[in-house]
């Protein structure tokens, strides 16, 4: 029984020597030779043995990790009677233990709901077993420490003891195998006449040392290779050396051999670097970690440092380098990319390497959490926990597991969208609404529904879809909730979930997905679907095995299962025979690599800026170790580990080493280079840093040609270069050659034409063909005023809404338009109620105004937006505030009526084919016509002598005024149109002709009076009346004005209308008035605008042409902004800037342009 240690720096030939030595021994005897290497290294070592000619295909040799050797020996000696717990199972059991002890925890009670907490606890328990630290020892070490550390250890002790109790000596963790292995080695016949070779470790845990000790006793020989600096073991341990851990392992092995009485053969020390093929790489590896500064005198060969603008530029530069190395004769398997933060680069690398046609293996396990099956389970449980809220329900729906498996996915998705729209619009946010008896009723009504017509065929069809999809969700989910609510034990909870998955045909759906992915060539995706089911099956089996008989509640079950779901990962396929490997630096176990790219070499990353992580902080660890705890040292006491990691990278390649870093992150934040790069540049005076550019145009032609490495990737660069050429920059002939190369075969030319077409892209629309326009809008255009205003705001906005009939998804929320409808509805209801009771405005008391407003709100509240005003306490408060506004408006209108001769003669008057008044007909080109239809809020009439006046009142929830500029540009046609219609149809409406008296906006709001001193009730009333003054435009006729405000005196301004009388009895310039002739011109001009719009619509006008008036644009509140893609930075997308001109100028233009109809 002997021990031999092989020691030396990386690349000195230790592994090669061991393999060659075993190869020679196999020829001479029949012994078994067992290599033990780290878990991540077994595949590479097996590959190396297969490629080693003198080992005859591995006959007589076996490759194990410590855990795989444990399985082998325990299978032989009978130590596998206990159930193995995976990492997922461990975290679930720890969560159960923590939940059971939650009330007793002093410091971790809140952490029990923190994501990652159980993973950290699992890592701590793993460390305790590896380092053979008992919980009793830890408690003892913490006795004299701070309250914080004491409380932490107290909580850990409670959780750990409960955890061990739940395992109940029936289950095994990975670390338990090493303990059992150490116990069973002596009983193994397999290990008789064997020699053990241990390679690839930089240090050993206490458990591993115990196993090695037993192997020393059992096996003929144990040979162990260690990477260290030979002079250090000859001159004693250096606390700050990067080889500290290896040197400690060296002394520990010698001590172990001494304790076991094992003979120590003469150690072999390897000093010469045999891996590096260039003097510069050998120098870098040999001098790394030396205290004495040494510099390299010549220009370094095959050692490069690159800066990149950002991470994408860095990866694209590396992809070009890899393509060049492949052209130079290297295989992809000879190349590896290493990074400290794989999460910063994995997705980017995958995308870029695919574009450069570089086969790449990303050595990173991906979490299963985003797989639809895992999301379905989690969302289903969340839906039950949170009373069937919208978010978890539809997260589950969108995974498609509720759908009928026999129907097409696209059809099911469409039906699910219809259901989702209904749920959002109707505010279905709880279980009671989902499970309520009877079908859900579908009505395509938005806003106020006071007059509900019978359902249409379309509504009945939509209703059947909604209820079909509703039942697909409610039936299985209700059953799941029922079974979960009845469950008491872990077994019953697991069965409830399993039966739910059976009910939705989860296995069949995953299998159909797997088959489809396989048929389409997505083999990795097919494996993921397969693993998803097997992982959930294993998780439930493990859950039942450990917690099946435990009493649980629903919250505990979902938390524990949630922990298990978080821990699930997809297993990795080993890399193919010829792929570039992308791996993280710390876990990479690579052999025989010729070219290494170390990326992301930034300050704070290499060396890592240490942060506390895990259950114990660095300070906690230092304190516990000071009390003889055997926990691992804190990060700050492992100063040499960062140097060792860097050493591992720079000593890995035999041929070439590329080091790179980005100068900025994705957000443009500046990133500095690593201190290690500064150190290397200091050692190599002739080493020049290069730059990976996003724009190579400033480089020489030869350098620019290096950017052309693959057809797909080059096409993007070519596009950007041609874009610069369009702007007047010089273009290298390199890019013209690249351009021509794309048109040498048909397939590439098609791809190139598609991509390069973006050079000439303009975000413009073409006019619709005449037949298309007529099919969309009809030969007779039935339009509303607001639709025409939308056309003049932006033609494309009109096309999207009225041509394509796009509309925003409805939401169960009270919007400004809904409040406007409530105000209109209230005023209509109150006016109608007054008429029914033979009452008139101006004759009501304040109390009657309040009562009328209250009755109106009681009538309207259930009829707005699916009873939204009755849906919550918050909505009840909003209803109260709306009632205040309606009450105030009723009071003001009543007060105004006392001073006015005008009285309503029409409320909510419809005009159109089925209206009280016929539509406004506008003749269009080609014998077409435009029929204008709509509803007028209120029409008032007043008479004096033989003159009759009509005016329009419009209720607004925000402040409005009539701007002639907006009328001229077609943005505010409503009021003058309504006035034109009522004046034109006065004979039909009131039996006589009438004059236009004006158009006025009544602002419905709850006014407040601001004053610097206390005011009387009368003064307050006066101020409130002023703030309620209507805005708009009125007839500049003393008779009409006096009828509107009979209290108006000379030298005073009206508190009702926008009028002011001078001392001489004339209207002042501050009045907002127009003459009868001007009103007629405006009415005529408005008709002209409708004719203009109608003809343009028939001509197919769909331009993206939003206006800009002052700072206002229709894009601010446009639902179609993302759809049209309007971008003012593009030459093809510019606003129509509208001039804000004086009223006199506008009226003159209207007169000139209005013409005659």
From Swiss-Prot:
GO-annotated biological processes: double-strand break repair via homologous recombination; recombinational repair
Record keyword Transferase present: no
Cofactor note: Binds 1 [4Fe-4S] cluster.
Database matches in PROSITE patterns: UVRD_HELICASE_ATP_BIND, UVRD_HELICASE_CTER
Domain of life the protein comes from: Bacteria
GO MF annotations in UniProt: 3'-5' DNA helicase activity; 4 iron, 4 sulfur cluster binding; 5'-3' exonuclease activity; ATP binding; double-stranded DNA binding; metal ion binding
Cofactor: Mg(2+); [4Fe-4S] cluster
Note: Despite having conserved helicase domains, this subunit does not have helicase activity.
Assembly with partners or alone: Heterodimer of AddA and AddB.
Membership in a protein family: Belongs to the helicase family. AddB/RexB type 1 subfamily.
Protein name: ATP-dependent helicase/deoxyribonuclease subunit B
Record organism: Listeria monocytogenes serovar 1/2a (strain ATCC BAA-679 / EGD-e)
Lineage: Bacteria, Bacillati, Bacillota, Bacilli, Bacillales
Gene: addB
